[in-house]
Amino acid sequence: MYSTFFSFCAIVQEKEANCMELNVREEKLKGLFKQFQVEHNENCKTVFIDNNDPELENYLKTDYIVYLHMVDKEVRNLDLTKVNTIFVNKEYASNLENGIQDEQRILELLLKKYPNLRAVLITDKKGAYYKDKDLLIYQKELVSNFDKDLFLVKYMASELKGNSEMTSLYRGVNQ
């Protein structure tokens, strides 16, 4: 019962008066980032998008803040100055970096290419790492692939509630 619920969950934003509430609804996780496009205040638009999405270049030309999920395509030819955070799984990142397996080294190389970005590296069974130019945080061990998706949902919910990635990931380490 629980696994069915969580395997089809995504986050939906609802606004009531001056507050925003997040509700979980049952929906397939396929295209999670594309489904999770939301304005979290009047002046700031945020989009979670896969890097193979045909609309990516359009979002990079607008006032949207872009959270980029790197899935199957290189993005070096794009202007990534509007990208806030890159989400990438270890297998994909390792392929980009000539097979390197060390998570911290992969993150260093990603940030060398994209120095103003923040990166979340999602590992197979070990959890996830957050890295920016000043900070490296590890999200404790996750149990399965489904948990990797749940981690992303928690991360996005934290963003919408106004918490920074660093705060939400730090809480995850200490829970």
Where are the regions a protein language model picked out?
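Catalytic-core segment of enzymes that process non-peptidic bonds
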Residues: F5-Q13
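Alpha-helical scaffold segments in soluble metabolic enzymes
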Residues: S7, L109, K154-Y155
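Ribokinase/PfkB-type carbohydrate-kinase core domain
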Residues: V12-Y138, L160-R171
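Short glycine/threonine-rich catalytic loop with a Thr-x-Gly-x-Asp
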Residues: Y138-M156, S168-G172
